[in-house]
Amino acid sequence: ILVGQELARALKIQAIFADKENDELVLKRGFTIRKGEKISVAEDVVTKGGRVQQTIDLVRSLGGDPVAVGIITDRSGGNVDFGIPLYSLIKLSLPTFDPAECPLCKEGKPLTRPGSGAKS
């Protein structure tokens, strides 16, 4: 949220954010998007790009015009394409593993899933 707020302040535009409800992103808190309003999507980290794509889809479904994605850390390895420009401050190449190939899984070590999408 902080990244988006500061981006909006620098661009002198409205800052809003989407909430997750029943596995879908929605606008709450009185936020609205005007038809044709240009929207820049901000995120802290992108690995597969699912949340960013959901946000772009939400903006379009509400009549907005997503024009760019700004992220702090790009972990995608260049494997995401949102159809609009993507800008990042850092590009990191970190290994990711399928569960069958994960060395920690093979050693029987428990895994945790950090982040805002984790369910407790």
Question: For the regions a protein language model found, what residue spans apply to each?
Answer:
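Short, glycine/charge-rich flexible loops or terminal/linker lids adjacent to PRPP-binding catalytic cores
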Residues: 1-40, 47-50
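Short, structured secondary-structure boundary patches
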Residues: 14, 36-42, 88-92, 109-110
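A contiguous pocket-lining binding segment that forms or flanks enzyme active sites
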Residues: 32-71
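PRPP-dependent phosphoribosyltransferase catalytic core
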Residues: 56-120
